[in-house]
């Protein structure tokens, strides 16, 4: 059985120095930058900057949009989740990161810094949060910030997440291992997996027309061309 390996195709270059989170929308591609904490909305066809929003977040790693158009950002290095008005760019609310902690490789090192969450997705009023320290996806009720469910993810360093076409399934990227898996959230069952060439690091991830988009924190943004049906 051959390994399933995606073919990355660079489509544009991020306007920020360190893109770390993506969210697809009809208006364009939303990008949060870990280097300058700015949000950019980019044109799908050419990467032109359609909007730029300055945020008060701290080295962020995930972004999504809710049903009312508000922007949610995983502010990784102060272990918070920000809800931001798309219209004004002002912070509406700040929540604690549900998965904040110390990454597994650093937990025995004295003085290791706590960090927060990464990839975000939205569905039916709930926020789904991928956390490298906890190695879970946390489903949060945004009305009272209560955890409804948590899903153990495969791998070591979960980052970008994106809804799959299959109901209840999500694509999950592990940056350190260079793999993307399709898992069922209710029980962590894995239904598909593919590798990414070592020249590419998948940090942020989103999906448009059943094609996965990625950002590498060295500025490339592109697509992962791969058969979305398991062949093993």
Where are these regions (language model features)?
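Beta-rich, blade/repeat-based domains predominating
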Residues: 13-26, 56-67, 99-124, 153-168, ...
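Short loop/turn segments that connect beta-strands within beta-propeller blades
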Residues: 43-47, 85-89, 141-145, 184-188, ...
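A short beta-strand motif characteristic of beta-propeller blades
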Residues: 7-13, 48-53, 90-95, 100-110, ...
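Blade-level signature of beta-propeller repeat domains, shared across WD40, Kelch, NHL, RCC1
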Residues: 201-232
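Blade/loop signatures of beta-propeller domains
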Residues: 1-5
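Short loop/turn segments immediately following the C-termini of beta-strands
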Residues: 34, 76, 132-133, 175, ...
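Conserved beta-propeller blade signature
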Residues: 28-31, 70-73, 126-129, 169-172, ...
